[in-house]
Amino acid sequence: VLERLKEPMDSFDPSQRFYSKAKYMGAHCQGQKEIAIDNIGPTIRSEHHGNIEFRRLSLEHGGMYKDELQKGLTERRLTPRECALIQTFPPDFQFVIPKDYAWKQFIVSASGAYKVIGNAVPPILAYHIAMRIQNLWSTYFK
């Protein structure tokens, strides 16, 4: 899901470009793990205090994406866009909404976007629940 995304500094998508800059606090703290790109995604929490999981950790902090680090990509946390894709939102749904073209002020900031995504029911899960209710509706409500 995340492989085709540009790195934040190369993206013009505000939901990919802006992300939490919270520093690594040590493996004993919440949100200090690097996600596994080819495995089940992490729970996206609404209340993370900036400690959203890492997309990539440095070698010093136990990072496993050595090829990316050797290319000069740096340690960083997941972006709102990456969190939204993990939660099954459509790739064009906007979460970070700039107030102006200079991207200095925001209607919805990256921090606000993380909260929206973390509080949401994943769209594909909601769809399957709705379909199940629709299929059973006539059984329980005649």
Show which residues each predicted segment covers.
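C-terminal target-recognition/interaction regions appended to catalytic cores
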Residues: 7-142
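A conserved active-site cap/scaffold subdomain adjacent to cofactor or substrate pockets
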Residues: 1-4
